Swiss-Prot record:
An MF annotation (GO) of this entry: rRNA binding
CC terms in the record's Gene Ontology section: cytosolic small ribosomal subunit
Gene behind the chain: rpsO
GO biological process, one term: translation
Name the UniProt record assigns to this protein: Small ribosomal subunit protein uS15
Assembly with partners or alone: Part of the 30S ribosomal subunit. Forms a bridge to the 50S subunit in the 70S ribosome, contacting the 23S rRNA.
Amino acid sequence: MSITAERKAEVIQGNANKAGDTGSPEVQVAILSERIANLTAHFKTHTKDNHSRRGLLKLVSTRRSLLDYVKKKDEARYKALLEKHNIRR
């Protein structure tokens, strides 16, 4: 499940470090978290949708890789990201 362009713009604006920032790890993690939340809601009604479940696992893995990168570069930013998006570690 994808997110709408309007919702994606809101997520980017809420997490951007500066104007026009769409590629920072914070923004990427925020977008992935939004997509993961949408898929999680989808699975509440479609429990046997294993093809989408594989996509969810790929999204979680990508987010995990980005979080590992942020943790390696700056632990304070990493902890702030976990807290802001309610991500369990």
